[in-house]
Amino acid sequence: MHNASDIQSALVPMVIEQTAKGERSFDIYSRLLKERIIFLVGQVEEHMANLIVAQLLFLESESPDKDIFLYINSPGGSVTAGMAIYDTMQFIKPNVSTVCIGQAASMGAFLLAGGEKGKRFCLPNSRVMIHQPLGGFQGQASDIAIHAQEILGIKHKLNLMLSEHTGQPLELIERDTDRDNFMSATQAVEYGLVDAVMTKRG
């Protein structure tokens, strides 16, 4: 019985390159990494975050003065996993240009907005969605109260950071993230989540 990850890895295309030493084959994502392109696809969770962080650190060590391009197609996910990626993006020396392909929702939208100002893009038919962090903790009443307090603290911190990245007042961010708030690529530009809609490679 094959699990989903086995099937997924079997479907990743291989690229053959001619080199002075003969042929070399790469999976498509490794080949794109050579071009300083990282794909953030699917749910944001700890394992994926560790891989993204490792790639960011590797590309910084390779060329600290060259931009990194982070392509995002994600419904969001774990706040702590997302913050590991976000903090690394801010920490490393290269500028991280973010590009939304498909969708950037929840933590995906936050990471999109966290790219280098002036280098954050959406493709024309992509969608962006912002909202408040979700809580699903179960347990004793006192523990639930502790987790509720933690979520409120995280919500306020994320809103402050989103306000900083978009240039929107905190009160507006608080109101607009109270419920799921979907935006087209153009609306995401107007809101300040990204800087431009990219239709053709320049």
Curated annotation (Swiss-Prot):
Protein name listed in UniProt = ATP-dependent Clp protease proteolytic subunit
Record bears the keyword Hydrolase? yes
Q: What is its EC number?
A: 3.4.21.92
User: Which GO MF term does the entry hold, naming one?
Assistant: ATPase binding
What is the uppermost EC class here?
Answer: hydrolase
Q: What is its main location?
A: cytoplasm
Location(s), subcellular: Cytoplasm
Q: What is the recorded function of this protein according to its Swiss-Prot or TrEMBL entry?
A: Cleaves peptides in various proteins in a process that requires ATP hydrolysis. Has a chymotrypsin-like activity. Plays a major role in the degradation of misfolded proteins.
Q: Which family does it belong to?
A: Belongs to the peptidase S14 family.
Q: Enumerate the catalysed reactions.
A: Hydrolysis of proteins to small peptides in the presence of ATP and magnesium. alpha-casein is the usual test substrate. In the absence of ATP, only oligopeptides shorter than five residues are hydrolyzed (such as succinyl-Leu-Tyr-|-NHMec, and Leu-Tyr-Leu-|-Tyr-Trp, in which cleavage of the -Tyr-|-Leu- and -Tyr-|-Trp bonds also occurs)
Instruction: Could you list this entry's UniProt keywords, alphabetically sorted.
Output: Cytoplasm, Hydrolase, Protease, Serine protease
How is the quaternary structure described? Fourteen ClpP subunits assemble into 2 heptameric rings which stack back to back to give a disk-like structure with a central cavity, resembling the structure of eukaryotic proteasomes.
Judging by the UniProt lineage, the source's domain of life is Bacteria
Question: In the UniProt record, does the keyword Hydrolase occur?
Answer: yes
Q: Which residues form the active site?
A: S106 (nucleophile), H131
Please name the InterPro entries in this protein's record: ClpP (IPR001907), ClpP/crotonase-like_dom_sf (IPR029045), ClpP/TepA (IPR023562), ClpP_His_AS (IPR033135), ClpP_Ser_AS (IPR018215)
This protein's GO CC annotations: cytoplasm; endopeptidase Clp complex
One matching Pfam family: CLP_protease
> What's a BP term from Gene Ontology annotated to this protein?
protein quality control for misfolded or incompletely synthesized proteins
List the top taxonomic levels of the source: Bacteria, Pseudomonadati, Pseudomonadota, Gammaproteobacteria, Alteromonadales
